[in-house]
Amino acid sequence: MPIICKSKCGNRAALKRPKTGDALCKECFFAAFEAEIHHTISSSNLFRRGEKVAVAASGGKDSTVLAHVLKLLNERHNYGLELVLLSIDEGITGYRDDSLETVKQNRDDYQMPLKILSYEELYGWTMDRIVAQIGRSNNCTFCGVFRRQALDRGAKLLGVDSIATGHNADDIAETVLMNVLRGDTARLRRCTSIRTGGGEDSIPRVKPLKYSYEKEIVMYAHYKKLVYFSTECVFAPNAYRGHARAFLKDLEKVRPSVIMDIIYSGEQLRFKDTVKKPERGTCTRCGFVSSQQPCKACVLLEGLNRGLPKLGIGKKTKGERMIAKQNQELALRERANLVKNDF
């Protein structure tokens, strides 16, 4: 006997929604998925009418669905946004060169202007050359740092008001786990924020897909027949994030709600006033936002150019060492006070 769509539209169900377990037809799934993203955007006031927004486009499922849905919602709900695509070419043969063809297809399909910036033109290096220098153990550190700054550089060139990234619920839950496991309180503070950055010296980043499950994004792209690039980065298997992802998938098997549980827990975390926040400023070399002097991108680039590629890896800045020392001293004083009060 066929299962009928739970939305009571009368149609036969075509899928079981991962997030809720509801049996839905394709059209009702599309409507629910799009409505949730619209609610996320409107309830969080992610955009203002008249703003220019850059969609960080990689050609993958997340950025492709993000571009498609933002264009659709912008027209349906009259957001009044000017949407553009911003893509970063890291210089990874057999991966990024192919995915950029998909980005160009997105440009044509959604009629959005596209800007492509490469590591080679920004830094004088490609990831292929960097990996040849350092091996595969720390390549994601270089790529992540350079990519974040490259997006800022591209956004500044385009004169946009914000950058919309395709981070989904799974990504954010993984990041919470990674930061807990690493004891990185600075990143743990902001990793669940739907908006980061902003202010006079930086362009804010927003995450419209923050509460969207990865499985649902794949289903949406599949049933909508969207064109996206599905090959994993050739350097990704060695990434630390992969271990957090595998752990999360194991947890999800025994507790299907674990993704949202972790996100909500991250949102509710409170930090002691004694835990210092890193102060954000402007790098004295490149002029872009940084919490250290010089910024991490400049330190890594200097190491590459000097033939010392591991110069900036695994080392803390003087400021970070001072903050760590202050936190350690405060913890020791608190412990001493507790012992004193026990007597």
Swiss-Prot record:
Single GO BP term: tRNA wobble position uridine thiolation
Name this polypeptide is given: Cytoplasmic tRNA 2-thiolation protein 1
EC number(s) per entry: 2.7.7.-
Keyword flag Aminoacyl-tRNA synthetase: no
Keywords: Cytoplasm, RNA-binding, Transferase, tRNA processing, tRNA-binding
InterPro entries: CTU1-like_ATP-bd, CTU1_C, Ncs6/Tuc1/Ctu1, Rossmann-like_a/b/a_fold, TilS/TtcA_N, tRNA_thiolation_TtcA_Ctu1, TtuA-like_LIM_N, UPF0021_CS
EC top class named in words: transferase
Source organism superkingdom: Eukaryota
Family from the record: Belongs to the TtcA family. CTU1/NCS6/ATPBD3 subfamily.
Pathway noted in the entry: tRNA modification; 5-methoxycarbonylmethyl-2-thiouridine-tRNA biosynthesis
Keyword Repressor: no
